[in-house]
Amino acid sequence: MSIIPLLHLARELDHDYRTDWGHLLEDDFGFGVHAHDLFHPRRLLLPNTLGLGRRRYSPYERSHGHHNQMSRRASGGPNALLPAVGKDGFQVCMDVSQFKPNELTVKVVDNTVVVEGKHEEREDGHGMIQRHFVRKYTLPKGFDPNEVVSTVSSDGVLTLKAPPPPSKEQAKSERIVQIQQTGPAHLSVKAPAPEAGDGKAENGSGEKMETSK
């Protein structure tokens, strides 16, 4: 009897064991989602032929080297996923598929956007679990905190956006004043009325002085 089928079986069992535990520990809710990931949806993984259970579902397939990126993001390394800032303004996306919309809050404190997600203890495939995260994003200089908007998609991606600040040309207050055509100027322009009781003589006016005899 060949031992090759047994080797394949052992490899599959080891892979499923590592995968299930990896997904259990890889509860990466609240982390950023790269724009590239949004265009590569993950297929729902059905139970394999061995009947060893269903892997944890996440709506997006992570890009190559995701586990290394996760560790760098958690440590705040140089390759951490940062908000995108460009000509279209400020934008950041994050995976919140583990939370319902009413379990999320977004608020602005000064020029910082604070995102919080929390749900009470509930049962999942591994037991009881309670999730809570808080993420903060500082708006770049010039961005108006009052312009921040947030959306959450049906597949669990929260997006924060803020329009770009106005350019220097747009910041200047400019208004075109319409020129109206009128009749003779003396009919439309009023002469300024002199102020009463100011006690001052106007230019060219005479002043009579009385002397005592």
Curated annotation (Swiss-Prot):
GO CC field: cytoplasm; endoplasmic reticulum chaperone complex; nucleus
Keyword Phosphoprotein recorded: yes
Modified residues (Phosphoserine): 58, 75
Highest taxon in the source lineage: Eukaryota
CDD domains: metazoan_ACD (cd06526)
One Pfam family named in its UniProt record: HSP20
Limits of the sHSP domain: 71-182
Molecular-function GO terms, alphabetical: unfolded protein binding
Keyword line: Phosphoprotein, Stress response
Region spans: Disordered: 157-213
InterPro entries xref list: A-crystallin/Hsp20_dom, Alpha-crystallin/sHSP_animal, HSP20-like_chaperone
GO biological process assignments: behavioral response to starvation; chaperone-mediated protein folding; defense response to bacterium; defense response to fungus; determination of adult lifespan; protein refolding; response to heat
Basic and acidic residues composition bias: residue spans: 197-213
Family: Belongs to the small heat shock protein (HSP20) family.
PANTHER family in the cross-refs: HEAT SHOCK PROTEIN 22-RELATED, HEAT SHOCK PROTEIN HSP-12.2-RELATED
Name of the protein described by the UniProt record: Heat shock protein 27
Organism field: Drosophila melanogaster (Fruit fly)
